[in-house]
Amino acid sequence: MDKQKSAPSKWMISSMVVVAAIVALAIFVVVSNLGGKPAVDTSASTTPAGEVSPAGAPMTSATAAAGSSADGGASFCGLTAVEMTGTLTKAPVATWQLFGTTYVPAVDGHGPGKIDDDGYRHCYARTPTGALLAIANYDALDNPGTDAFTEKFVRTGTAPGPGREAAIEKLNEKLKQSATESSNPADRQIFQTIGFRILSYDGNTALVETASKSSAGYKVAWVQHLVWAEGDWKLLLADDASSLTDPTLISTLDGYIPWSA
């Protein structure tokens, strides 16, 4: 990593994992306040290969429900592919489409099975490929940067339960403040998926780690929890709408499966 570069400012990336993520719709919290440079050159990813649960990830009522709840229903948009076990050992062949300033993937039969008129992408197959596609597309939902997109994701893209309810409450508070606040688009960073690995998958839950590169040149990895609910893959939030795991700055893609447009 170029030590002359300053570390990226704190950005809660992608839609949904932390309170600021829900507000800002950006899927990676890039480490901030590092004194102008990363404190450690973190070449290791958020979760070492072979581990299926990041250390310190809190148990939530949503997590417990995901492990013991029923099916979650058939695909709400009619995707028929279902795999209750499995993983990915190579990158799926995807069609990449420019969405805002980020390329997003699609795989026939695995999703997204529904793209709304406003560009909102959802409905992914109950397969390891579908889970990966869900995360890669959710990462890009920040691009439109509208309150409507943010609210839609919080209400439909997060797992039902206390985390979603807390997120809606936080979002409503943010929307009330937005009339008196302003942001500088130039301060925002855009993230592009460049790699992944599936840490665990059982058809009801998935633990997916993605590696992305920011517009400032930094690489970041983050493990994200998905649960199958309401006929789609949903991002799992802690009960207070905070993140279940933290992102990590990385220097290489060692250990990841490269995957990009």
Regions found by a protein language model. Name each.
Residues 4-5, 16-17, 27-35, 51, ...:
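Low-complexity, intrinsically disordered terminal/linker segments enriched in charged
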Residues 99-175:
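Core segments of small alpha/beta cavity-forming domains
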Residues 147-232, 237-242, 246-254, 258:
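Structured, amphipathic secondary-structure segments that form assembly/contact surfaces
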